[in-house]
Amino acid sequence: MKLKFKHQKFQEDAAKAVCDVFGGQPYKTFDYQVETRKKDGQTSFEKFTGFRNHPIVPQLTDEIVLKHIRDIQRAQQIKPSEALEGKYNLTIEMETGVGKTYTYIKTIFELNKRYGWCKFIIVVPSVAIREGVHKSLEIMKEHFASDYSTPLSYFIYDSKQLGELNAFVTDSKIHVMIINSQKFNCLLYTSDAADEL
């Protein structure tokens, strides 16, 4: 049985709102020289290109981002934020059962379309939700392929699957890494593990 997904305005509005926060950011891809480590611990630079999201341009100041957020909040009759919650720590809230997963996948495609961003990490609270997100991406892949010409690759983080990590770094198409929060925090806050990521 094949599932059919309807385009719903509130989901499109949510994706647009997230993109509008970064209004003024130009469409750019950002390539860089990839660093690899040899087994003996020595660092070497390979002669291949990696891709990452282009940094937020300096003209898009915190004040401008906060203004964009407040404009979006006022349009939705939400009390405007007094300050940013951190460097672009956006909280997007939706009711249960209204298609949050669909909406954030759509948002990924829209951020790519508007700004050229192509690297996304979905951090989930549990292994069960991680598996559910992976399945949702699999189910919705064809649906989004009909709306967007950019292919999307996705995988569950596994430090033993270096091919997936290599593709995440070196490929210019949209890549989504799914990781549970415990592993993400371990990689983020452990110096030895941070080198692994």
Annotate each language-model stretch with its function.
Residues D147-L188:
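Inter-Walker segment of RecA-like/P-loop motor cores
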Residues Y189-L197:
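Conserved small/polar residues in nucleotide/adenosyl-binding loops
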Residues Y102-Y115:
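Walker A/P-loop NTP-binding motif
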Residues Q11, Y104, V133, I178-N180:
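Conserved structural-core and active-site-/substrate-pathway-adjacent residues in large, well-folded domains
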